[in-house]
Amino acid sequence: NSEATTRIEVVSNVQPKLLKYKIVNTYPHDYQAYTQGLEFHRDTLYEGTGNGSGPTGKRGISSLRKTDYKTGKVYKKVELADEYFGEGITILNNKVYQLTWQNNEGYIYDADTFKKEKTFPYFKKIEGWGITNDGTYLYQSDGTEKIWKIDPATLKEVDYINVYSYETKVKSVNELEWIDGKIYGNIYQKDAIAVINPKNGAVEAIINLVDLKSKVTQLPDTDVLNGIAYNPKTKTIFITGK
């Protein structure tokens, strides 16, 4: 007897709503930082950068840094070797998890000292894009429509969701941030943020940020929107680009 496997994919029945926003402040940011990850921890802004290049071809430096968000001053920074493209970051239990793009590995640092405590392989052959956490589990994007749910104790996949905006599959899900039970995700090359239900992958809302580009200093290497950080102290969302 031959057995056939049928793959069934469930699309979303939710029509995303358009959320409004208000700019409450603007802060300085290193324009040479090719931002891949952004997160607050104890009122300090942590940032992961990659060595990608903007429109002029000038390359950035892959790094992990923590900064004073009000002044842009960098308190501490560690750089990755040039063969590694730094990607998303998240902080769980005072540990910083940082992904690399195509090296199939990530790093765990002490959030205070930036001492690298572990190098870990991905649970399967995927690219590393964005990462966030819900206080218990990690959530990792890989440039497709998938977001993987990962056990931080084993760094193995326990589940995944496919991201859909109504009936349309949403690919290139990039930087992630967990805010009030939802995953806020940058979509690569789109000037918008998707608000994603972590249980089923449905995009429940969209934040259209196309107008932000005209409000930043227009530099030759200004690239795309990337970087979402929620500050629980101020209850505001910090947005940047690379």
Language model features with spans:
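Beta-strand-rich domains and repeat architectures in extracellular enzymes and scaffolds
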Residues: V24-R65, K77-T90, G130
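Short loop/turn segments that connect beta-strands within beta-propeller blades
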Residues: T67-G72, D110-F114, D151-L155, N197-G201
